[in-house]
UniProtKB/Swiss-Prot annotation:
TM segment ranges: none
CC cofactor note: Binds 1 FAD per subunit.
The protein's name: Sarcosine oxidase subunit beta
Organism: Rhizobium meliloti (strain 1021) (Ensifer meliloti)
UniProt lineage: Bacteria, Pseudomonadati, Pseudomonadota, Alphaproteobacteria, Hyphomicrobiales
UniProt subunit comment: Heterotetramer composed of subunits alpha (SoxA), beta (SoxB), gamma (SoxG) and delta (SoxD).
Length: 416
């Protein structure tokens, strides 16, 4: 069924009794050309582009829980492409361009809202760094504007300009950045992949990877053995655990990243604002709630919840940027498991094990990269060679010394 204003109207008049399920609930087949482990945004996007762009439809997406129960539904919904380094900039700009046409592409309302992302700066050195970043963006054809104090104050008068410990000097603005409804992204890709013949198999946990003569031939699951010609791992924070089933150790640590939403408030934040003197970012949802987050919890964990020390740290940073937040009540919080790589950049590559491919190490950048990640991973699986914008995301770059360290923090995953 194709969604349209007319179909919504007609089904509403009929009591919404004639809607077809958005995707099937198939039983697994004995063998697939490609099995994708992980039914999150990246896994579903990979399946969608494999079918749509490369004509490979004998594909299964295996999800141990329900579709969208992982990180794709546990983030703060921000999209942007304001990256500095050559390895990152073209890739995230590809993702931004795919976001811009996504709803028309898969005929699903993902609520893409390009309302701008503003990164505040608070010192001369930070201003110079943002100027450099903005110039690099513009050289790659990405929009960027450097705003000074008066322009920022006119745009966001509720920020603390008069009594701030770290005075606001200005900000770097990307107007094409914004937010997207994260659940709708998972549902849209799932619906699009399923309509092209992909099997989305929920409540099917991978418990082992079967190898024969040094190559992967399938996976052991809670629903039995399923064979495959190629196995693609897109398991986010659980990537290390799944790869270990094949005897592969990854340069990745898993950390919890918490996110929060407040009570509904009168609209006052038009776009996304990030605090340059602390790790804090905030936007306002359609319901009026403030959606915000900050640093990861600094210890390794696979729990989808965090600790109170980080909650306090995030609240302090938010209050320093917007003093009025001190009176706002938090409704709920949640956590996602971040696959933190050694240099803060992702891995999209084949592994040393034949027929085993990896999509992992996304750190904070996973959600905003969803379309490009799926497209580039599908290209790798279909063609056997990396897509040009993802060519730098090799697994062996740590051994070769070709790191993509956007923040310049060195080989310490919990700092990226």
């Amino acid at each position: 069924m194709r969604y349209s204003a007319l179909s919504i109207l007609l089904n509403g008049l009929r009591g919404n009794r004639n809607w077809a399920p958005a995707w099937r609930q198939p039983d697994p087949k004995p063998h697939y050309d490609v099995i994708i482990v992980g039914g999150g945004g990246h896994g579903l996007a990979t399946a969608y582009y494999l079918a749509k762009e490369f004509g490979i439809t004998n594909v299964a997406v295996l999800e141990k829980n329900y579709i969208g129960s992982g990180n794709v539904g546990r983030n703060t919904t921000i999209i942007r492409s304001n990256y500095l380094l050559p390895g990152n900039n073209p890739f995230y700009e590809l993702s931004m361009k795919l976001w811009e046409g996504l709803e028309q592409d898969f005929n699903f309302n993902a609520m893409v809202s390009q309302r701008g992302v503003l990164n505040l700066f608070h010192s001369d050195a930070q201003r110079d760094a943002y100027t450099r970043r903005g110039n690099a963006m513009r050289l790659h054809g990405v929009d960027a504007e450097l705003l000074y104090r008066a322009a920022v104050r006119k745009m966001l008068p509720f920020l603390d300009f008069d009594n701030a410990r770290f005075p606001i000097q200005g900000g770097l603005l990307q107007r094409r950045g914004g937010t997207v409804r994260h659940d709708a992204v998972a549902w849209g890709y799932a619906r699009g992949a399923d309509s092209r013949g992909v099997d989305i198999i929920q409540n099917c946990e991978v418990t082992g990877i079967r190898r024969e003569n040094g190559r992967v031939i399938g996976v052991e699951t809670s629903r039995g053995f399923i064979g495959c010609a190629k196995l693609a791992l897109a398991a986010a924070g659980n990537s290390s655990q799944v790869a270990e089933m094949a005897g592969l150790r990854l340069p990745i640590e898993s950390h919890v990243l918490q996110a929060f939403v407040s009570e509904g408030l009168k609209p006052f934040i038009d776009g996304v604002v990030t605090f340059g003197a602390g790790h804090f970012y905030v936007s306002q949802s359609d319901k009026g709630g403030l959606v915000f987050g900050g640093d990861i919890d600094g210890y390794n964990s696979y729990a989808q919840r965090g600790n109170l020390a980080t909650v306090e740290h995030v609240a302090e940073a938010g209050k320093a940027m917007i003093p009025a937040l001190s009176r706002v009540r938090v409704l709920r919080s949640w956590g996602g498991i971040m696959d933190m790589s050694m240099d803060g950049s992702p891995i999209i590559d084949r592994t040393p094990i034949d027929n085993l491919y990896l999509n992992a190490g996304w750190c904070y950048g996973g959600f905003k990269a969803t379309p490009a990640s799926g497209f580039c991973f599908a290209h790798l699986l279909a063609r056997g060679a990396p897509q040009k914008t993802a060519a730098a995301f090799r697994l062996d770059r740590f051994e070769r010394g070709f790191l993509i360290d956007e923040k310049g923090q060195g080989a310490q995953p919990n700092l990226h």
